[in-house]
């Protein structure tokens, strides 16, 4: 992925799995919990898993998904 490099430093500091409830907090508000839930319901979000009642994302999948939607502006 062409934008993958911008997330390399972030990847090293995150846990391997992130709950949907914490994505916004961990990524500095880049995407809200509600927006992520809506994208998931439309099949447009990152790959997800359910652990108990929580929706979670592998950090690798989440960052890969973000990289495909990132446009670097000059």
What positions do the PLM features span?
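Small/flexible residues
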Residues: 13, 50-52, 56, 60, ...
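Polyanion-binding surface elements
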Residues: 4-35, 68
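Intrinsic disorder/low-complexity detector
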Residues: 5, 40-42, 63
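A short, Lys/Arg-enriched interface patch at domain edges and termini
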Residues: 62-74
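Major-groove DNA-recognition helix of helix-turn-helix-type DNA-binding domains
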Residues: 26-56
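Short, well-ordered alpha-helical scaffold segment located
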Residues: 22, 61-62
